[in-house]
Swiss-Prot record:
This is A-type ATP synthase subunit E. It holds the Pfam family vATP-synt_E. Keywords: ATP synthesis, Cell membrane, Hydrogen ion transport, Ion transport, Membrane, Transport. One of its GO terms (molecular function) is proton-transporting ATPase activity, rotational mechanism. The gene is atpE.
Length: 195
């Protein structure tokens, strides 16, 4: 074997080895590129999922906020309607006159007077416009006197030093109790709801 043949064999081996190294390097480079592309796809998918989740969350928050605002507006409209009804009732109570007003005032005074049996002096307060009516009714009660004005729709507030009791039998207090006890029914009827 000549030196040239040996050199040629070494060169062939070196070429073969270089070819293998290049093939391994190309294969490894392809693997690295594939991994990088897969990682990039995962990163993009994660980012898209995160953005989608944020968009969904923002949409839900805006929807919830809008629903809450609408509910508050409905409740406010209901409150306004109920207040309007109550104001109308108060106006009708204030407008009561004649025998009907006298009968109701007398019943409220009778109910209050049971708390003051045996009291020497009983003071009765009422609406300024009802002074004459209350004074006339008090003529039937010994020891009772009209003591002045009380800001109310009608009825009486009765008190005595002897018993240290004050009874509020005004139309306002009766209306407040009736309103509270029947608010659900009033609301249901006003807004056509089933109870």
């Amino acid at each position: 074997m000549s030196l040239e043949t040996v050199v040629e064999d070494i060169r062939d081996e070196a070429r073969e080895r270089a070819k293998e190294i290049r093939a391994d390097a190309d294969e490894r480079a392809d693997e690295i590129v594939a991994e990088a592309e897969a990682d990039a796809d995962d990163i993009i998918a994660d980012a898209e999922a995160e953005v989608t989740a944020e968009i969904d969350q923002e949409r839900e928050q805006q929807l919830s906020s809008a629903e809450l605002e609408a509910k508050q507006m409905r409740l406010e409209a209901r409150r306004d309607a109920l207040q309007s009804v109550r104001s109308a009732v108060e106006d009708r109570i204030v407008a009561l006159d004649g025998d009907e007003r006298e009968e109701l005032t007398r019943e409220l005074l009778d109910a209050a007077s049971t708390e003051f049996d045996g009291a020497d002096t009983v003071r009765v307060f009422g609406r300024a416009d009802d002074e004459a009516l209350i004074s006339e009714i008090l003529d039937d009660y010994d020891g009772y006197e009209y003591a002045g004005e009380y800001d109310c729709l009608g009825g009486v507030v009765v008190e005595s030093d002897a018993s240290r009791i004050r009874v509020n039998n005004t139309f306002d207090s009766i209306l407040a109790d009736a309103w509270e006890n029947n608010l659900k029914a009033i609301s249901a009827r006003l807004f056509d709801e089933e109870q």
